Amino acid sequence: MFKHNEQQPEGFQISLKEALDNLAFNDAGLVAAIAQQHDSGEVLMMAWMNREAIEETLATGRVCYFSRSRGKLWRKGESSGQVQTLKELRIDCDGDALLVKVDQTGSACHTGRRDCFYWKADANNVTIDKAPIKDPKELYGK
């Protein structure tokens, strides 16, 4: 459906139901979702969403993912307070990935770092190049 409509003019619309019906969810019913800070373009994290998480996110404006480890919906910030407020949700041209533009409160990463991409690779090494902005023990009480 997405490829079929890629030559449509700007302003062309389909229903949310049709778009969700045609997303390329994987065998587990999930689609990759990249969270990006809406005003700076900073890439914060990658997580997974199922249809229910997408629908809840769009309905509430608070970003909800699907936790593979817990096997349930994960409302970002429900235990840490580090909430993501939805600014815009975009679907890529193949319908197999989402870009979730957010306003991130505090850190996005469970390590207490602003984002999850703190390992920087070059031809010889991989180096941690970002410090936590908050102690994870303070975020999660562990």
From Swiss-Prot:
The protein's GO terms of the molecular function aspect are: magnesium ion binding; phosphoribosyl-AMP cyclohydrolase activity; zinc ion binding
The keyword Transit peptide is assigned to this record: no
GO cellular component labels = cytoplasm
Which terms under GO biological process does the entry name? L-histidine biosynthetic process
Q: What is its EC number?
A: 3.5.4.19
Compartments where found: Cytoplasm
A Pfam family cross-referenced in the UniProt record is PRA-CH
The residues the record assigns to binding Zn(2+) are 93, 109, 116
Q: Where does Mg(2+) bind?
A: 92, 94, 96
Give the record's family classification. Belongs to the PRA-CH family.
User: What name appears for this protein in its UniProt entry?
Assistant: Phosphoribosyl-AMP cyclohydrolase
